[in-house]
Amino acid sequence: MERISWNQYFMAQSHLLALRSTCPRLSVGATIVRDKRMIAGGYNGSIAGGVHCADEGCLMIDDHCARTIHAEMNAILQCSKFGVPTDGAEIYVTHYPCIQCCKSIIQAGIKTVYYAEDYKTHPYAQELFEQAGVTVEQVELDEMIVDLKNREKLSFVAGLIGKLADAGLAEEELKKIHEQANTLFTSYV
């Protein structure tokens, strides 16, 4: 059985964390990792016990939601709160960090940033990471890896295609169905 890569594993964790987001504008998750071990996670949302944007709407000041703590900051603050060092760690984020999070990541001593999607990627954030010697790499999440029924679905579809072939479906039609299955099961077919 083929196992998923560490990058895919930790990026999937960040996407799961993003599901806890209370921001209706963008759901973001972040996972801090050291030595292939998760040391903290965060998602964008309000302060503990505070009003959530999902309930009351965003509190916009200077085109930013003042109510929301970004996922990266939440993860870094979890480490700070519980005395877990971040020096030399890696962070996996669903979206490219904003300038403020970029500065916090650098100050926390995090050495590598993995992100899945560009989102308002600012050239100054890129410049700061480069100046600080922080490695930045895009790791797009293969969504198939978080589908817990993927193998069963793949097996089922392969069985159906086999039955269609046995039933005498035209080769051209079988080819079309197989191509459609390939797009659904990109990583595994």
UniProtKB/Swiss-Prot annotation:
It comes from the Bacteria. SUPFAM superfamilies: Cytidine deaminase-like. It holds the Pfam family dCMP_cyt_deam_1. Its EC number is 3.5.-.-. The active site is at residue 72. Its cofactor is Zn(2+). One of its GO terms (molecular function) is dCMP deaminase activity. PROSITE patterns: CYT_DCMP_DEAMINASES_1 (PS00903), CYT_DCMP_DEAMINASES_2 (PS51747). The keyword Kinase does not apply. InterPro entries: APOBEC/CMP_deaminase_Zn-bd, CMP_dCMP_dom, Competence_ComEB, Cytidine_deaminase-like, dCMP_deaminase-rel, Deoxycytidylate_deaminase_dom. GO terms for cellular component: cytoplasm. Zn(2+) binds at residues 70, 98, 101. Keywords: Hydrolase, Metal-binding, Zinc. The keyword Ribonucleoprotein does not apply. Residues 5-132 form the CMP/dCMP-type deaminase domain. CDD domains: deoxycytidylate_deaminase. GO terms for biological process: cytidine deamination. It is an enzyme of class 3 (hydrolase). Belongs to the cytidine and deoxycytidylate deaminase family. Dispensable for transformability. This is ComE operon protein 2. It comes from Bacillus subtilis (strain 168). The gene is comEB.
